[in-house]
Amino acid sequence: MTIHDPRFSDVIIIGGGATGAGIARDCALRGLSVTLLERHDIATGATGRNHGLLHSGARYAVTDAESARECIAENQILRRIARHCVEPTNGLFITLPEDDLGFQQTFITACTAAGIQAEAIDPAQARRLEPSVNPALLGAVKVPDGTVDPFRLTAANMLDAREHGAQILTGHHVTGLIREGNTVRGVRVFDAQYNEHRELYAAVVVNAAGIWGQRIAEYADLSVRMF
């Protein structure tokens, strides 16, 4: 009988937001042993403090086609695998009297090229869809934006990751990295519940700490300026 030592994992993930939770689930589904560390509780950083908009990528279509394609791909994935976390509200890009109505076709063409469904609608239809819209609008384009519940999405990923063997440790503050030369072998962590310092080891350490990722990078003598 093989007894797993909880100090050792294939992957350690630092950060319990949407990104960390998604990585934990993906790794666990691939059969890797996973330890996720969060210094507070899940989704208490930027994940729990954002507007919850699920971008279609339309806003980037004309000026940044690559970002637009990435957005719509993620949008479609989340609608497929996390429908219970998503509300498909759609979004409107409106044209006002001071705008160039001809740009509407440029916008639709760019959206279509990026794989984003964009539909021109008349002002009356736009007003029916959104009664608070500026009544002076000349036209509108409907795109597949939506809203997503960030906490619910994070919790769902965490639960599925744990069901597939991941170890989720909240109240665990990473205080340093364990290094061998230029290679990170693990982390030093403070367990707030038991008031003790521990060392955990993994073949791969993922920095998913959001804005605090700069501090984690500094433990490895890396300069990643985030603020």
Model-derived segments and spans:
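Flavin (FAD/FMN) cofactor-binding and adjacent substrate-gating region
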Residues: 94-164, 169-170, 176-183, 188
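Glycine-rich FAD pyrophosphate-binding loop
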Residues: 28-48
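Core beta-strand elements of the Rossmann-like FAD/NAD(P) dinucleotide-binding domain
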Residues: 7-9, 194-204
